[in-house]
From Swiss-Prot:
Protein name: Peptide PGLa-R4
Record-level GO BP terms: defense response
Tissue expression pattern: Expressed by the skin glands.
Role summary: Antimicrobial peptide.
Keywords in alphabetical order: Amidation, Amphibian defense peptide, Antimicrobial, Secreted
UniProt-annotated location(s): Secreted
GO cellular component: extracellular region
Superkingdom classification of source: Eukaryota
Organism: Xenopus ruwenzoriensis
Coiled-coil features, chain-numbered ranges: none
Residue numbers carrying Leucine amide: 21
Family: Belongs to the gastrin/cholecystokinin family. Magainin subfamily.
Length: 21
């Protein structure tokens, strides 16, 4: 559903942010 999709997007952004550090 929408919640799972939003969670996946947030997780992806968090991963990219951590990699950027």
């Amino acid at each position: 559903g929408m919640a799972t999709k939003a969670g996946t997007i947030v997780g992806k952004i968090a991963k990219v942010a951590l990699n950027a550090l």
